[in-house]
């Protein structure tokens, strides 16, 4: 495996990690894993990229605070519900349609566009995650899969075509609304763990665009 393929695999893992955080509340077992050597090393390695240092530091700070927070898992689940599962007036709803479509209704054109992309690349939405296709977790999972598919291409033109598809997807399907999503989450997540995660998401997307554009 060459260095670029290895780097792509790391990128895919980051997007899948983020997808998992937006898909469901963390269980008690998952929350405990965030204090493990493996995950703390993962976060430390990410923080060594200067552009990511501050956003990873915010996540680590909140993880450390959770260790002394009473009923941490229950409270963090409540934070998740407060941040993402309320109404559009008091939550940061994780659907592109709420930000990109004038109707501000679920399952609008951005969701159809995402369904078309899933079909185009023959990527199946997880059956147990019954959400509109433009949910942030589905979009991030798709991107992780698209990156892995890039590594599977056998010719340089095909590889470059898939790299270009990643760049287009991030710009059109994610950075078109993720900054506003992050802003709302920072306003509506009182404790701040998910606000830190959305801030890292936007920071990483912006950095990834520079990588894909060859800057």
From Swiss-Prot:
What biological processes does GO assign it?
Answer: protein complex oligomerization; protein folding
Q: List the disulfide bonds.
A: none
**InterPro entries in UniProt:** Chaperone_TorD, DMSO/NO3_reduct_chaperone, HscB_C_sf, TorD-like_sf, TorD/DmsD_chaperones
**Entry's localization field:** Cytoplasm
**Where is the chain membrane-spanning?**
none
Q: Which residues form a coiled coil?
A: none
**What are the entry keywords?**
Chaperone, Cytoplasm
GO cellular component terms listed in the entry, alphabetical order: cytoplasm
SUPFAM superfamilies to which the protein is assigned, alphabetical = TorD-like (SSF89155)
Name the major location.
cytoplasm
The UniProt entry's sequence similarity note says: Belongs to the TorD/DmsD family. TorD subfamily.
Record's NCBIfam families? PRK04976.1
Question: Which PANTHER family does the record associate with it?
Answer: CHAPERONE PROTEIN TORD, CHAPERONE PROTEIN YCDY
Which function does this protein serve?
Involved in the biogenesis of TorA. Acts on TorA before the insertion of the molybdenum cofactor and, as a result, probably favors a conformation of the apoenzyme that is competent for acquiring the cofactor.
Name of the protein described by the UniProt record:
Chaperone protein TorD
Starting at the broadest rank, the lineage of the source organism is: Bacteria, Pseudomonadati, Pseudomonadota, Gammaproteobacteria, Vibrionales
